[in-house]
């Protein structure tokens, strides 16, 4: 079974949103034209260390602290910086097991999609939920203590989510790469 299928049309199969082709290239080029080399360096530094002092950030990008602060405020206001958060150690906090789950819904109607999305939002074990094109509807990233906890989660939460017809579970054996940093030019 192929993991990736080509979209049926712009906007995607099964109601998946998004643009394919030239529009995404235009958006990327527009973003790059609005950000200069210093903006990109600021974003790169902040991705690596969100707690860097304004003074050290200014030294890293060779601008005054006042100019850097103004740029960071503009990048935040313009939506390039969404926020700052601490990266926690899941092993030390009883969430050492990561499991990816493919979810196939019984119907693909707007009501089912909305009910599923609303139910997923309130579950802390579900860290990420992505609507995808292909042989299933959603891909979930979950974390919990161990397989016994996942088994309980599957029976009491996952299979009770609105519209779920079928799931496939992929326990992670090793996290080879785990980053939130975007590759900036």
Residue map of PLM features:
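A compositional/biophysical signature of low hydrophobicity enriched in polar/charged and small residues
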Residues: 1-185
């Amino acid at each position: 079974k192929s993991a990736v299928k080509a979209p049926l049309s712009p906007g995607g199969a099964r109601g998946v949103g998004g643009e394919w082709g030239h529009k995404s290239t235009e958006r990327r080029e527009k973003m790059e034209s609005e950000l200069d080399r210093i903006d990109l360096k600021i974003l790169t530094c902040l991705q690596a260390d969100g707690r860097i002092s304004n003074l050290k950030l200014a030294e890293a990008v060779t601008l005054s602290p006042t100019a850097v602060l103004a740029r960071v405020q503009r990048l935040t206001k313009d939506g390039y910086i969404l926020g700052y958060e601490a990266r926690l150690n899941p092993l030390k906090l009883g969430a050492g097991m990561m499991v990816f789950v493919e979810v196939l819904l019984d119907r693909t109607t707007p009501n089912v999609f909305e009910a599923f999305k609303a139910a997923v939002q309130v579950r802390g074990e579900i860290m990420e939920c992505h609507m995808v094109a292909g042989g299933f509807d959603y891909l979930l990233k979950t974390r919990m203590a161990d397989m016994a906890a996942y088994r309980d989660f599957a029976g009491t939460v996952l299979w009770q989510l609105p519209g779920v017809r079928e799931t496939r579970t992929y326990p992670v054996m090793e996290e080879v790469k785990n980053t939130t940093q975007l590759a900036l030019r």
